[in-house]
C-alpha cells in the first residue's frame, strides 16, 4: 500500500531534486568554473564544427546504449564511486583539452561510458533494479535532460515534459531490445532512441567542446571542464532517480503534484 502524505525528509529530497533538474545549465557552470563565456567560445569555433560534434555525440550515445543493454545491470550501487568516476573522466578531459576538437571522437565515447556507469551506480543507490531494461534506459535518459531544444522555464515544459517525451521513445526501444537485443542497431525503435538522446546530449557537448577548444584552455582546463561535466550529470542523475524513488513510494501523481507546486529552485512546496 502506497503512502499518501510525503514525509518532511522526502519533501526535502524532492526539493533538492527539483533544484538540480530545473536548473541544469551546463554552460553557466562551465563559465563559472573557467571564466570563459560559452557563447564567446562557440563563436571561436570553425564553421564546420557542428558536424564532428554531432557525429561524436551520436557515436557516444550508441556506445552507451550497448552498455545499457548489456553489462550495465552488473553495476554496483552507492555514490562512493562518484569520486573514481570523476577522476577517470577528468583524465580523459586532459587529453581533450590538449588536443582540442580532433580528440572529441576518441574522448567522448570513453567519458560518456564512464559517466553512464556513474549514473547507474546512483540509480541503484536510489533503489532501481538494473536487471530491468527500463531502468537501464532511464540511466541513458539522464544524458537527454538539460539539453531540451527550445526549452522555456515553465514547470510543465521542464523535467516532466522531457520525461514524457522520452517515455514514448523508450517504451518502443525497451520492447525491441528486450525481444531481440541490439543485433540490429538500424532498427527504427533503436535509431529513434539514439537520435533522441544524441540530439539533446549534443547541445551540452557543444557547450563543453566550445570552451575546451579555446587555445588558452590547455590540458588543465580540459580536465576541469570534464570535472564540471560529470558533476553536472551526476547531479541530474541523483535528481532524476530521487523522483523515481519517491514515485515508487507515493505514486506518480502525488509526486508530480508536489514537484509542480514547488518553485523552480525548490524553495517552496505545498504546506503539510
Residue ranges and their predicted role:
Residues 88-106, 113, 117:
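Glycine-rich active-site/cofactor-binding loop and its immediate structural neighborhood
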Residues 110-113, 233:
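Bulky hydrophobic/aromatic packing residues
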Residues 107-111, 222-225:
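Short hydrophobic alpha-helical segments that form membrane-spanning helices or hydrophobic packing faces
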Residues 1-92, 117-272:
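Terminal, membrane-proximal amphipathic helices
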